[in-house]
């Protein structure tokens, strides 16, 4: 386990409380990307899955959300248990071999 993974694993439990997200800004940014329906989206550094609730209204075919920190992924999975469109994976973005995405969000 590297230092980055360790840091984010220790922050996972309180991440949503300490990391401020502006819903208006998130929606504006996503609207400007012209996300289309039925897209395959890769969310790199997904953390606790905050963006997924903003991505789902665009009716994607699939969202693959990756993060290096296993505890972040566990928190995200708890938010979307067994969601048919979202797959949360503990992966390093530099070694992830997924292919064929219409959009990649960093």
Regions found by a protein language model. Name each.
Residues 1-36, 38-45, 50:
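Conserved class I S-adenosyl-L-methionine
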Residues 16, 43, 67, 92, ...:
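Acidic active-site catalytic centers that drive phospho-/nucleotidyl reactions
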Residues 36-38, 60:
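A general structural motif
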Residues 38, 101-102:
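Local beta-strand N-terminus motif with an aromatic residue
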Residues 48-95:
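Class I SAM-dependent methyltransferase SAM/SAH-binding core
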Residues 105:
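A conserved beta-strand element that flanks and buttresses the S-adenosyl-L-methionine
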